[in-house]
Amino acid sequence: MATTNDLKNGMTLDIDGVLWNVVGFQHVKPGKGGAFVRTTLKNVLTGKVVDRTFNAGVKVDVATVDRREMTYLYRDGADFVFMDSESYDQIPIPPDVVGGTADYMLENTVATVALHDGAPLYVELPASVELTISQTDPGVQGDRSTGGTKPATLETGATINVPLFITSGEKVKVDTRDGRYLGRVTS
């Protein structure tokens, strides 16, 4: 148990049996009336984001979430198999838990897996990863009708927009949070 005054970004709360991550919070002390805390919460399972207001000092349940470093090994049917870096246990994780991070995972990718009561909640990759462009159309000199970008397919199968000068076979850095091209990787 903690109070709303102890909230921090990244905390996981158990509200009515549903797990929520604190994305943002603000303590508000109006001139009239009691203080309160405005929070932005993200549902751990569905990803839905809601705004919720708590009175200051109200007790909230903080869920115990174990964050472990794991290595993605392979796909087994629909499941993704991860290996715990400490215990070397192999854990199958369903695709709905892995979510959109699968677009940026290759074998032997190190990720952080959040577990609650031994069950995986979500998989978190580093902020950026380096991947190879498997297919993209050649950029035509002077073609600026598309804003200077073109679609490219990564080695994982995901599609991102890259600048016109990028060619197939090049390594690029990609933001795993929104799928943006960050830059070319130089050897």
UniProtKB/Swiss-Prot annotation:
Q: Which GO terms describe its biological process?
A: peptide biosynthetic process
Q: Which UniProt keywords apply?
A: Cytoplasm, Elongation factor, Protein biosynthesis
Q: What pathway or pathways are given for this protein in its record?
A: Protein biosynthesis; polypeptide chain elongation
Which SMART domains does the annotation name? EFP, Elong-fact-P_C
Question: What PANTHER family does UniProt report for this protein, alphabetically?
Answer: ELONGATION FACTOR P, ELONGATION FACTOR P (EF-P) FAMILY PROTEIN
Subcellular localization, as worded in the UniProt entry:
Cytoplasm
Cystine pairings recorded for this chain: none
> SUPFAM superfamilies, from UniProt?
Nucleic acid-binding proteins (SSF50249), Translation proteins SH3-like domain (SSF50104)
Quote the Pfam families the UniProt record gives: EFP (PF01132), EFP_N (PF08207), Elong-fact-P_C (PF09285)
Record's Gene Ontology CC terms?
cytoplasm
**Could you say which residues form the signal peptide?**
none
Family classification: Belongs to the elongation factor P family.
Q: What does this protein do?
A: Involved in peptide bond synthesis. Stimulates efficient translation and peptide-bond synthesis on native or reconstituted 70S ribosomes in vitro. Probably functions indirectly by altering the affinity of the ribosome for aminoacyl-tRNA, thus increasing their reactivity as acceptors for peptidyl transferase.
The protein's GO terms of the molecular function aspect are: translation elongation factor activity
Name the predominant localization.
cytoplasm
Q: What protein name does the entry list? A: Elongation factor P
